[in-house]
UniProtKB/Swiss-Prot annotation:
<dbReference type="GO" id="GO:0006083">
    <property type="term" value="P:acetate metabolic process"/>
</dbReference>
<protein>
    <recommendedName>
        <fullName>Butyrate kinase</fullName>
        <ecNumber>2.7.2.7</ecNumber>
    </recommendedName>
</protein>
<keyword id="KW-0418">Kinase</keyword>
<dbReference type="GO" id="GO:0047761">
    <property type="term" value="F:butyrate kinase activity"/>
</dbReference>
<dbReference type="InterPro" id="IPR011245">
    <property type="entry name" value="Butyrate_kin"/>
</dbReference>
<comment type="pathway">
    <text>Lipid metabolism; butanoate metabolism.</text>
</comment>
<comment type="similarity">
    <text>Belongs to the acetokinase family.</text>
</comment>
<dbReference type="GO" id="GO:0005524">
    <property type="term" value="F:ATP binding"/>
</dbReference>
<dbReference type="GO" id="GO:0005737">
    <property type="term" value="C:cytoplasm"/>
</dbReference>
<keyword id="KW-0067">ATP-binding</keyword>
<dbReference type="GO" id="GO:0008776">
    <property type="term" value="F:acetate kinase activity"/>
</dbReference>
<dbReference type="InterPro" id="IPR023865">
    <property type="entry name" value="Aliphatic_acid_kinase_CS"/>
</dbReference>
<keyword id="KW-0963">Cytoplasm</keyword>
<comment type="function">
    <text>Catalyzes the conversion of butyryl-CoA through butyryl phosphate to butyrate.</text>
</comment>
<dbReference type="InterPro" id="IPR043129">
    <property type="entry name" value="ATPase_NBD"/>
</dbReference>
<keyword id="KW-0547">Nucleotide-binding</keyword>
<dbReference type="GO" id="GO:0019605">
    <property type="term" value="P:butyrate metabolic process"/>
</dbReference>
């Protein structure tokens, strides 16, 4: 029997919603929130009644009867580290989302709003593969400095979705494949997927791995320390140089990779150097992950917005095809990925996990 799901994906200035019947999209909407509307609230949690009302009003305008829903799936927020999968929203999760235990982010509202609507309909609410998915093997956590442990923050939802898609298209289960997945968007994450777990991945938020349109990636540590103590920058300014104002935008003044590629291929040497350096760093990170998988790699999957670039994907392929075949799944579809996570539970393919 077909299942109907409402998907809620809150961002800082908008809330994306979608209604699906199984994997078929019935409709989707991006509900934009002005700075004035958001500015009324002193923190993210306070926005939840406002955003919930906007969602319900749009569903009403569309003439959609929410009583026909079987489940609601929200974007997973900044929770305590968890293994990948679909989690039923429970009291422990709601408490951590409300209190922003790992930080404030609009995605914290996905589970809260989903639960509130689901409760009134007596149906389950889920979250799927939040950014805090942490399946690193113990050896991967060692950094070389006891005070600092490597942690896992990356594009878990899209990484897991395309890995499962690759497995399905090759008539295998996700638990039976070894692949390297490369997400190239505003940030870059390269993950080693082994038997259904991402056993190593760069921290895509916090200055590790390849640079990206607006993040620095890993930089020489001694020089960074000296920059921190140069007296020229505050703590917040240094953090912004790592995440937000680093990478391509720091070198070229733009975070639009289409513009970077256009100018590079039109003969601008500086743009070409930065574009090729991005390709070089991504390829090097793929090589590292292939070693983590001990050379046993079924495929290298390129995904995210930058994977639409023929030049970038071709150049990466030229560098890494000796490791494994390269597969392209450009872009990302978070609404569908969240839907699929909910359906796996509703169809009995897997059990909902419990957040503790």
């Amino acid at each position: 029997m077909a299942h109907k799901l409402l998907i809620i994906n809150p961002g800082s200035t908008s809330t994306k919603i979608g209604v699906f019947e199984d994997e078929n999209l019935i409709f989707e909407e991006t509900l934009r929130h002005s700075a004035e509307e958001i500015g009324k609230y002193s923190n993210v949690y306070e926005q939840f009644p406002f955003r919930k009302e906007v969602i319900l009003n749009v569903l009403k305008e569309k003439g959609f009867d929410i009583n026909t829903l079987d489940a609601i799936v929200g974007r997973g927020g900044l929770l305590k580290p968890v293994e990948g999968g679909t989690y039923e929203v429970n009291d422990a999760m709601l408490k951590d989302l409300r209190e922003s235990v790992r930080g404030e982010h609009a995605s914290n509202l996905g589970g809260i709003i989903g639960n509130e609507i689901a409760k009134s309909l007596n149906i389950p609410a889920f979250i799927v593969d939040p950014v805090v998915v942490d399946e690193l093997q113990d050896i991967a956590r060692i950094s070389g400095m006891p005070e600092i442990e490597r942690t896992s923050i990356f594009h878990a939802l899209n990484q897991k979705a395309v890995a499962r898609r690759y497995a399905k298209e090759n008539n295998k289960s996700y638990e039976d494949v070894n692949i390297v997945v490369v997400h190239m968007g505003g940030g870059s994450s390269v993950g080693a997927h082994k038997n259904g777990k991402i056993i190593d991945v760069n921290n895509a938020l916090d200055g590790e791995g390849p640079f990206s349109p607006e993040r620095s990636g890993g930089v020489p540590i001694g020089d960074l320390v000296r920059l921190c103590y140069s007296g020229k920058y505050t703590l917040d300014e240094i953090i912004k140089k790592i995440n937000g104002k680093g990478g391509a935008v720091a070198y070229l003044g733009t975070n639009d990779f289409r513009e970077v590629e256009e100018k590079a291929l039109a003969g601008d040497e500086k743009y070409k150097l930065i574009l090729d350096a991005f390709i070089y760093q991504i390829s090097k990170e793929i090589g590292k992950c292939s070693v983590v998988l001990e050379g046993n790699v079924d495929a290298i999957v390129l995904t995210g917005g930058i994977a639409y670039s023929k030049y970038v994907t071709k150049e990466i392929e030229n560098k890494v095809k000796f490791i494994a075949p390269v597969v392209l799944y450009p872009g990302e579809d978070e609404l569908l990925a969240l839907t699929q996570g909910g359906l796996r539970v509703l169809n009995g393919e897997e059990k909902a996990k419990e957040y503790k």
